[in-house]
């Protein structure tokens, strides 16, 4: 086991626990404490910790799907933990060298999801610009040894086929340009909604070969019905995907949740699905489904305990200074050059702690 980028006192303590046979992996708990104690403040101008010798990509290499889990080059089950950007048409200023150094070397993240909205003043307005921005972020994440999820953030219209030709153009360009890298994951449909699983499946079976033609080895993430809820938000269940999977290999299915809105029914569906099909939580928050309002840390912790137990990777929404409670930074942080813990909202401090939990690579 490689404990990546962990302060020496933590590594020693963990080694001591292992030597006594004590369990250190988190398990699903129904008695999690809901409160969050803010981390000690780091001054605004304090530099991020220096890079360590082993990055997530160095430790794991090219990822692949093995059975119902994500595996590294050595065939070991791995869980990635990290953050999602907000829409890059609105918050590109939140992704710079300083913020990514903080994410990589202070938060100890493994992955960032690059959210390219299609509509809402996104990709469709300037395909060349947004494609170049994705490639720029991939370069920046690669320099820090992080994995990059290329998220085609379709949302409204909810039928992914509406943007099929745009998606083909986008993924061809990005995959062709980055096909020599071993740290790229493709998410081909953010939150399909208002259409059947069969319609979504048809889209996936058209777009997956487009990615495969340029990048045959990358893991591809597939959105599920009803805002990637496995159909639960439409009154269905995971069985529609389990019993009728996409005809493709090396793929995983996505699940999104917002803890203050999505309770036991959603958690149970995720748990059942993860035993049958490969799952990846590409978006979640501790707030309501709009990413705002009060935090429900207790319910969020139950989800993350399950994810740790079943090695389900996740990225949290979102790495920005948006006014909503789901953005990790306080307003005015991005572009300031200062991303210390005193710039974090309550949810930001909580998710930083979750990401900093030592990896089991």
Task: Name the predicted role of every residue range.
Residues 96-157, 164-169, 212-214, 296-310:
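Aromatic-lined substrate-binding rim segments of carbohydrate-active enzymes
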Residues 1-36:
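Secretory targeting and sorting signals
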Residues 57, 61-64, 87, 92, ...:
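Extracellular glycoside hydrolase catalytic/binding regions
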Residues 14-15, 123, 161, 293:
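Alpha-helical transmembrane segments and their juxtamembrane interfaces
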């Amino acid at each position: 086991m490689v404990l990546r980028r962990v302060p020496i006192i933590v590594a020693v303590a963990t080694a001591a626990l292992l030597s006594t046979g004590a369990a250190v992996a988190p398990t699903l708990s129904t008695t999690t404490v809901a409160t969050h104690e803010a981390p000690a403040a780091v001054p605004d101008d304090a530099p991020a910790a220096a890079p360590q010798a082993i990055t997530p990509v160095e430790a794991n290499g090219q990822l692949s799907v093995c059975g119902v889990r994500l595996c590294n080059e050595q065939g070991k089950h791995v869980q990635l933990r990290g953050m999602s950007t907000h829409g890059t048409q609105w918050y590109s200023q939140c992704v710079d060298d300083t913020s990514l150094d903080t994410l990589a070397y202070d938060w100890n993240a493994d992955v960032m999801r690059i959210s390219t909205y299609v509509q809402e003043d996104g990709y469709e307005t300037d395909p060349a610009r947004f494609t170049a921005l994705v490639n720029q972020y991939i370069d920046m994440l690669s320099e820090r040894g992080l994995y990059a999820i290329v998220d085609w953030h379709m949302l409204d219209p909810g039928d992914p086929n509406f943007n099929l030709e745009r998606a083909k153009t986008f993924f061809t360009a990005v995959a062709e340009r980055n096909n020599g890298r071993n740290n790229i994951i493709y998410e081909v449909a953010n939150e399909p909604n208002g259409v059947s699983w069969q319609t979504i499946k048809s889209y996936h079976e058209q777009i997956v070969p487009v990615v495969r033609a340029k990048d045959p080895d990358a893991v591809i993430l597939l959105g599920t019905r009803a805002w990637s809820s496995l159909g639960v938000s439409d009154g269905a269940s995971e069985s529609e995907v389990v019993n009728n999977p996409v005809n493709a290999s090396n793929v995983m299915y996505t699940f999104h949740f917002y803890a203050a809105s999505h309770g036991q029914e959603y958690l149970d569906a995720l748990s059942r699905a993860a035993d049958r099909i490969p799952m990846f939580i590409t978006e979640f928050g501790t707030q309501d489904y709009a990413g705002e309002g009060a935090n429900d840390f207790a319910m969020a912790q139950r989800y993350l305990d399950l994810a740790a137990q079943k090695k389900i990777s996740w990225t949290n929404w979102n790495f920005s200074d948006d006014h909503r409670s789901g953005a990790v930074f306080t307003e005015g942080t991005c572009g300031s050059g200062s991303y210390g813990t005193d710039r974090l909202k309550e949810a930001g401090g909580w998710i930083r702690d979750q990401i900093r939990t030592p990896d089991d690579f």
